[in-house]
Amino acid sequence: MTGRGKGGKGLGKGGAKRHRKILRDNIQGITKPAIRRLARRGGVKRISAMIYEETRGVLKTFLEGVIRDAVTYTEHAKRKTVTSLDVVYALKRQGRTLYGFGG
């Protein structure tokens, strides 16, 4: 790096993008068996067919909130990498304290 400081390529040509943003609904990656395993862990014996889409929706809403808060902590600290502590603080802010990851 030649005197550009901390953060950014400066002016001029930008390099090739390393990560492309895929614009599809990744929530379908939470498979039916994965939801079934989570339910089994919670003690559920039988699962209605409508539960799967409902669970995906609730999970997406929950994760959007946690990720938004974690990214806010990251941006405030002028970092580009979200750390485990950012997630711990985001969960704590939402009233779901998580132990075992520092903080």
Swiss-Prot record:
It comes from the Eukaryota. CDD domains: HFD_H4 (cd22912). GO terms for molecular function: DNA binding; protein heterodimerization activity; structural constituent of chromatin. Glutarylation at Lys-92 (H4K91glu) destabilizes nucleosomes by promoting dissociation of the H2A-H2B dimers from nucleosomes. GO terms for biological process: nucleosome assembly. The modification N6-glutaryllysine is found at residue 92. Disulfide bonds: none annotated. Residues 17-21 bind DNA. The modification N6-methyllysine is found at residues 6, 9, 13. GO terms for cellular component: nucleosome; nucleus. This is Histone H4. It comes from Neurospora crassa (strain ATCC 24698 / 74-OR23-1A / CBS 708.71 / DSM 1257 / FGSC 987). The lineage of its organism: Eukaryota, Fungi, Dikarya, Ascomycota, Pezizomycotina.
